[in-house]
């Protein structure tokens, strides 16, 4: 089944010029309806999407873990830049995560020990590696941001509404008390 899925993805990626195509693009090619029919066996184009690209459901756990570690403003951290990791000014055993706070027109930072696998800076590195292939497809103003995901609308930074939706799912799944992120 996995080999067939890989072959089907290759055909779809050929039709899409290296990207997962829209349904109409598949139908526009000869034998497109049969390709689409075979794709349906794997959940259709939308079902194949998470096999190829990080989606909001992949990105949200990184966002939440970094948010908890930094105690940052949730809206400001949503717009965290890929260039946010800096060496500490004085100590070599620390590194700094720096982000903009647009409404306050200021910068905020938090320091973390170097080399900790699950520290916020290393989570940023992991997230950037995971979604590196999406950067070239993202909007120019969003390409430099950490929390880019692929969805129905293309490659975008995760939306504030999507974060709230994922948080509600997370709280429900883990039977946690309800709380809301506020800006």
Regions found by a protein language model. Give the residues of each.
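Extended accessory and catalytic-adjacent subdomains in large enzymes
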Residues: 2-8, 22-183
């Amino acid at each position: 089944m996995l080999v067939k899925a890989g072959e089907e993805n290759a055909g779809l990626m050929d039709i899409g010029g290296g990207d997962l195509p829209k349904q109409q693009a598949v139908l526009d090619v000869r034998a497109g309806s049969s390709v689409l029919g075979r794709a349906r066996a794997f959940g259709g184009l939308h079902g194949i999407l998470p096999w190829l690209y990080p989606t909001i459901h992949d990105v949200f756990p990184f966002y939440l873990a970094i948010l908890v570690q930094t105690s940052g403003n949730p809206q400001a951290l949503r717009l965290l830049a890929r260039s946010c990791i800096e060496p500490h000014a004085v100590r070599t055993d620390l590194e700094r995560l720096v982000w903009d706070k647009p409404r306050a027109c200021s910068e905020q930072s938090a320091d973390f020990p170097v080399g900790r696998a699950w520290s916020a800076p290393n989570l940023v590195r992991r997230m950037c590696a995971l979604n590196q292939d999406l950067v070239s497809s993202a909007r120019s103003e969003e390409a430099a941001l950490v929390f880019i995901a692929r969805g129905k609308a293309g490659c975008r930074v995760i939306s504030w509404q999507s974060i709230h939706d994922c948080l509600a799912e997370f709280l429900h799944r883990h039977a946690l008390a309800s709380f809301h992120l506020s800006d």
